[in-house]
């Protein structure tokens, strides 16, 4: 399951603390990105994991973050995956 949370930049540290310190959520793959990657304000948190991880993340951040709309979510996920592929290509070139 994949979700993307959207929140204000001023809440970045708080959201990181909440999610990364939680025993359930911290088992998921978590990536934080500035909204500028898709031309938006704020910050995004991409979470990929089991349904249990994603539901817990939503529950823990319900007062400071919201789930991104489908279009935004897809753009953020696409950008993150593109960056991952580019990093892997660079890594492959080093050890190629």
Give the ranges of each region predicted by the language model.
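Helix N-cap motif at beta-to-alpha junctions
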Residues: 8-12, 48-55
């Amino acid at each position: 399951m994949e979700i993307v949370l959207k929140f204000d930049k001023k809440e970045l540290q708080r959201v990181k603390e909440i999610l990364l310190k939680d025993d359930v959520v911290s088992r998921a793959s978590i990536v934080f990105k500035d909204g500028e990657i898709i031309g938006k304000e704020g910050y995004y948190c991409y979470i990929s994991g089991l349904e249990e991880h994603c539901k817990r993340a939503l529950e823990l951040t319900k007062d400071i973050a919201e789930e991104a709309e489908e279009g935004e979510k897809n753009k953020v996920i696409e950008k993150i995956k593109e960056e991952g592929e580019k990093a892997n290509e660079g890594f492959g070139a080093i050890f190629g």
